[in-house]
């Protein structure tokens, strides 16, 4: 990489207004009303940071067989199309890194990749990710729920300059705010689609504390068999086999 290209990013992050400009965009994410608004702010934040492209990925795994992926794309939409058509979510080395790590890392610092993982990275390089910074967003649900922000540049080694420490700090702030926003979206959607009530949440909290039906019934001044029936209905709402599985879904999606 030509030294002047490093200076472009180094000079940008040393600008006196750099942090304020980036933070101004980050602060707006909380009030984004939908994905379109979140994408608009991600594009703006990406530009203010000094990157060319960005992808934010949210991953939720309900159990061993069921997983869902959500994306905010601030890059060429053709990349998103190719990613989906090729099923690259199953071989994405950037997401794999985020599942087990919390520190930002440059893509070129990742351990040796498999052939399919290299295919994903080579595909991304054509759409503004010749170099990339991977910023994980950990969650209390560990590998069952994680997000990752990937920032890209068409210039190789773009994120290896002296100014990258401050860049990384701002990128982590952006990633965390996007993670909080996406978490609220997913939680609210499940609450609405499953028609979860405050009484349902109260049952789940009792289950979380290890209370059996008899203890819950005593606390709610009702019968144990009534509690059993309510848990059966709640489990059906959440697509869970039993109350323990229902609690797991609730914890993964942040209902309680």
Protein language model regions, located:
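Short, basic, alpha-helical segments at the C-terminal edge of helix-turn-helix-like DNA-binding modules
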Residues: 243-254
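Helix-to-coil/beta transition segments that act as allosteric "coupling" elements at the rims
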Residues: 118-144
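Juxtadomain coupling helices with adjacent low-complexity linkers
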Residues: 2-25, 35, 145-197
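Regulatory sensory and allosteric helical modules in signal-transduction proteins
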Residues: 73-116, 122-125
């Amino acid at each position: 990489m030509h030294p002047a290209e490093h200076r472009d990013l180094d000079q940008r992050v040393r600008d006196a207004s750099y942090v304020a400009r980036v933070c101004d965009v980050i602060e707006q994410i909380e009030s984004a009303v939908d994905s379109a608004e979140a994408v608009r702010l991600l594009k703006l934040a990406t530009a203010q940071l000094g990157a060319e492209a960005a992808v934010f990925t949210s991953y939720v795994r309900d159990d061993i067989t069921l997983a869902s992926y959500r994306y905010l794309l601030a890059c060429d939409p053709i990349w998103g199309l190719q990613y989906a058509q090729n099923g690259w979510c199953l071989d994405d080395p950037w997401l794999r890194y985020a599942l087990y790590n919390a520190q930002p890392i440059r893509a070129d610092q990742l351990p040796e990749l498999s052939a399919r993982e290299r295919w994903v990275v080579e595909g991304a390089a054509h759409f503004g990710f010749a170099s990339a910074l991977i910023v994980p967003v950990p969650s209390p649900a560990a590998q069952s729920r994680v997000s990752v922000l990937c920032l890209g540049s068409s210039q190789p080694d773009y994120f290896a300059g002296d100014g990258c420490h401050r860049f990384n700090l701002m990128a982590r702030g952006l990633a965390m705010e996007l993670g909080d926003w996406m978490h609220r979206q997913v939680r609210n959607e499940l609450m609405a689609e499953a028609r979860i009530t405050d009484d349902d949440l109260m049952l789940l909290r009792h289950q979380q504390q290890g209370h059996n039906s008899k203890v819950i019934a005593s606390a709610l001044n009702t019968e144990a068999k009534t509690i059993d029936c309510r848990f059966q209905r709640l489990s059906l709402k959440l697509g869970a086999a039993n109350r323990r599985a229902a609690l797991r879904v609730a914890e993964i999606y942040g209902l309680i």
